[in-house]
Amino acid sequence: MQSPATKGTLALAVLAVSLIMAGCASMGDNKPQSARIEANALDAGAAIRAADRDAGWPAADWWRAYRDPQLDTWIAAAQAGXPDARGRRGRVREAQAMARVARSAELPQINGNLSLMRQHWPDNVYYGPGPLANTDTWNNTGTLGLSYHLDLWGKDKNATERALDTAHATAADARAAKLELEVNVVRAYVGMSMNYALLDLAHETFERQRSLADLARKRLQAGLGTQLEVSQAESTLPDYERQIDSYEEAIQLARHQLAALAGKGPGAGDAIKRPRLSLDAPAGLPSAMPADLLGRRPDVVAARWTVDAQARGIDVAKASFYPNIDLLATVGGFGVTAPFTDFLRAMNGGWTAGPALSLPIFEGGRLRAQLGAANAGVRPGGRAIQPDDRRRAQGHRRPGRADPFARYAEEGRRTLGGRQRPQLPAVARRLPPRPDRLRQRAGRAAAIVGAHRKRPPHRSERLAAHAQLMAALGGGVETGTDVPGSQSSHGESAAGAAAPAAASGAKPVAAAARPAQVAAAGAAGVPAAR
């Protein structure tokens, strides 16, 4: 049987714990105002369901489908020397450092203090008298302190997880910016290719119109034509010259744009040759939509990591309502008499050890306000959809719209170019060049030029739409097997994320392995597995 003293001690301990817990500040009615929606619960829509499902996910170097080595070179240059690339890598390193700072709070802390002071001791009623009254001595102390915070409520652990989630979100944001840079380079390069094609048509049209003007002048010299015919034939030449100048200016502007995206001067773009783009890849969608897309779109991954970090912030805010218990220990030496090293003698040593407890009782509503802010910060989407995201979301519709245009332009080219253009010389040989026939010839030439002029924009639109589709599918980002929300310790906020993680085949990994993986991710500028 327990002695009465032991029973009394246990009763006092239970009473003390009860009073401590009751004395803590109240959380009030603070709870998250939103819940996460499962990806598989969303309707993908008839367009996605009817799309080709054999295309597969894009590769990390998806732009190589254009089969242009010069494009590959400039994308690599943009990735290495973009002006904001260093800033993105710096933000990733900063987030990694903050994660290490949060991690250090979970470990024991050892601090040393050394004080070497020459002191004059007073001689009065309050501070003296005594053996040291009105004397000058050394007051030297040296201590070594150990402190360890007992994380009974998971505050330090959740703070570390929040910092790691923030680091993952920063790395995913950096990868999203890198993908956007790749798309911008491809878009500028495709625009240059289109302007080169339009420039060829403008030169061809100008030469054709100049030959018609020469023919009109010869007719005038032979007495078969009029000055009006010459003026009509020459009136469009300045317009064609201005078109040539505008296309050449657009090409030069694209060169400067590519040089700027690569972080180089305008002169670097002068070495860019004419693009040789060729795209045979079909426009289709992967077989697992939309659940797998959550783990492949870097902007979506960043938003999910952000929501995950906000959920950890709720746990940190809740833990602030409970008592803090620290284990403290100090050992040191103290000396106030001669010699100078008197404090190092064993007889002058001392130590302290024991727990230290602090608890919030009245804090003016500060903790409840912090918890309310943490709950309000958790939003289903994590952040608003940006204009770039809307463009990517609309990009998958463009290939289907560009293909008919390209097909119609190709049919028009074969019809007008294959049938009418060979007949023009025969018509010119059989019929005398009368004014009405000159006008008919000019009309046929204009129809041919119009059909050809529509083809480059349609082809360019298809090439750009392919880049937008690759970006909308994530650009070949590999985020690893661990995804946001795969840790069950999130409680209510993680329950809704478990289904998307399971749908994409995600498996949680040990938290101890995360810092090294985050560091590797930051070095590469891409989100890594947690």
Swiss-Prot record:
Record keywords, A-Z: Cell membrane, Lipoprotein, Membrane, Palmitate, Signal, Transmembrane, Transmembrane beta strand
NCBIfam families registered for this protein in UniProt: outer_NodT
A Pfam family: OEP
Taxonomic classification: Bacteria, Pseudomonadati, Pseudomonadota, Betaproteobacteria, Burkholderiales
Segments of this protein annotated with the region Disordered: 375-442, 476-530
Organism: Burkholderia cepacia (Pseudomonas cepacia)
Record-given protein name: Fusaric acid resistance protein FusA
GO molecular function per UniProt: efflux transmembrane transporter activity
InterPro entries cross-referenced by the UniProt entry: OMF, OMP_efflux, RND_efflux_OM_lipoprot_NodT
Family, as annotated: Belongs to the outer membrane factor (OMF) (TC 1.B.17) family.
Metal-binding recorded as keyword: no
Protein topology in the membrane: Lipid-anchor
Signal peptide: 1-23
Gene assigned in the entry: fusA
Lipidation (N-palmitoyl cysteine): C24
Location in the cell: Cell membrane
